[in-house]
Amino acid sequence: MYVMTQSGWLEVICGSMFSGKSEELIRRIRRAQFAKQEVKVFKPTIDNRYSEDAVVSHNGNSVIAIPVATPAELFRYISATTDVVAIDEVQFFSDDIIDVVQTLADRGYRVIAAGLDQDFRGEPFGPVPALMALAESVTKLQAVCTVCGSPASRTQRLINGAPASYDDPIILVGASEAYEPRCRHHHEVPGKPKKQHDHPFAERASE
């Protein structure tokens, strides 16, 4: 990453599930802490799959985090001595997080936001696309497709072992769903509207 010469900016870490987003966020948090910077870490209260008060990677690494229900709550915990604001699972917040993050960066804070850029349908997820557009730095990570081993940019939702339908809720709380990384060609979403362009190249994949 290039070196910032001024204080106050936004970094976004995005990708599919199992791509190492939380691991990368934790790495940046620990690096800042090693540099004696004050870091405040946040996560949405809805994200309690592994822990209610920690950011936990799939490798088992973790850092303590403050669970918040709304973006505006971040301001209650951030002070003039804070240097870095880290936010995990940012896709679960409302679009209000965009203004909050912009305000923090404009006030001189280094903001690091990590989250899914696509939902299980393979469509833009919540505020993440806007944050990517506004960020000074975007790191898009890829996992490994569980079907073919190719780079995976999408998240496959499975319900009882079968691909979830397009009409399923974007966010499921307390459901018995499972997820795995998939590439573009092995990502399955039954019921997803087809988009066919009237162009000869559109038929190439089926030839």
Curated annotation (Swiss-Prot):
What domain of life is recorded for the organism?
Bacteria
Q: Point to the regions of Basic and acidic residues compositional bias.
A: 198-207
Q: Which InterPro entries match?
A: P-loop_NTPase, Thymidine_kinase, Thymidine_kinase_CS
| Keyword annotations of the record | ATP-binding, Cytoplasm, DNA synthesis, Kinase, Metal-binding, Nucleotide-binding, Transferase, Zinc
Record-listed ATP binding positions: G15, S16, M17, F18, S19, G20, K21, S22, D88, E89, V90, Q91
- Spell out the catalytic residues: E89
Segments carrying the region annotation (Disordered) are 184-207
Compositional bias (Basic residues) spans?
A: 184-197
Mainly localized where? cytoplasm
Q: Which family does it belong to?
A: Belongs to the thymidine kinase family.
How is this protein organized at the quaternary level?
A: Homotetramer.
Its recorded name reads Thymidine kinase
Origin species, per record, is Geobacillus thermodenitrificans (strain NG80-2)
Its ancestry begins with: Bacteria, Bacillati, Bacillota, Bacilli, Bacillales
Gene transcribed to yield this protein: tdk
